[in-house]
From Swiss-Prot:
Coiled coil: none annotated. The gene is rsmG. It catalyses: guanosine(527) in 16S rRNA + S-adenosyl-L-methionine = N(7)-methylguanosine(527) in 16S rRNA + S-adenosyl-L-homocysteine. It comes from the Bacteria. CDD domains: AdoMet_MTases (cd02440). It is found in: Cytoplasm. It is an enzyme of class 2 (transferase). It comes from Pelobacter propionicus (strain DSM 2379 / NBRC 103807 / OttBd1). This is Ribosomal RNA small subunit methyltransferase G. S-adenosyl-L-methionine binds at G79, I130, E131, R147.
Length: 221
């Protein structure tokens, strides 16, 4: 890996975002990216392997979500894969209690390796199907997020039993999020959930458009 190129790209991206990172956070992101590329040679973790694209499309993208979170919240990342956004969120907000879940054991092994390497406290990677958490982690999370995991309806159906009172679901989507939201309206209504806000944004360095879709249970009033 070109350590300098990754670091320079991430610094340029976060400067454009006006998201300040400490030297230690930059180092941790760099180590994460290095391990991601190394493990990806033998485990299918990501299709994004260019140093600059890892900096922007994995790290910077996760930082837009970090702006929606509070360090006192407990967060679940569903279908976490290589630990994205869970690990970048944990690096960006050290006090955030973070749990990731994925059904592929090798991906969870990678996440646990990175957590040990970076000495992440308050981070847990679970090898499980999301449905299996209903019995053990019901109503446990303030925020549940996913990136490229499923459509909005299935995301809500699988995660709603895990959401704490007053919590919210945040789906990381592409530029067609509005269309997907319209398609999911009937399903969301049947599940007694609603979209409460959309947060469209542009990735730095002209790297594409994304959108955060925030959903909550419908008030029982």
């Amino acid at each position: 890996m070109s350590m300098n190129r990754f670091r320079e790209t991430l610094q340029r991206a976060t400067e454009e975002m006006q998201f300040e990172l400490s030297g230690e956070q930059l180092r941790d992101f760099q180590l994460f990216a290095m391990e991601l590329k190394k493990w990806n040679l033998r485990v299918n973790l990501t299709a994004i392997t260019d140093d600059g694209e890892i900096a922007v499309k994995h790290i910077a993208d996760s930082l837009f979500l970090a702006r929606q979170l509070d360090s006192t919240e407990r967060v679940l990342d569903v279908g976490s894969g290589a630990g994205i956004p869970a690990i970048p969120l944990k690096i960006a907000i050290p006090g955030l209690e973070t749990v990731s879940v994925d059904a592929v054991g090798k991906k969870i092994h990678f996440q646990r390796h990175v957590a040990r390497l970076l000495r992440l406290q308050g981070f847990q990677a679970l090898h499980a199907r999301i449905e299996s958490l209903h019995a053990t982690h019901g109503r446990s999370f303030d925020v549940i997020t996913s990136r490229a995991f499923s459509d909005l309806g299935l995301f809500v159906r699988l995660t709603a039993p895990l959401l704490a009172e007053g919590g919210r679901l945040i789906a990381m989507k592409g530029p067609a999020a509005g269309d997907e939201m319209e398609e999911a309206k009937t399903t969301l209504a049947a599940l007694r959930h609603e979209v409460c806000s959309l947060h469209p944004y542009r990735l730095p360095l002209e790297s594409g458009e994304r959108c955060l879709v925030v959903m909550r249970p419908v008030s029982k009033i």
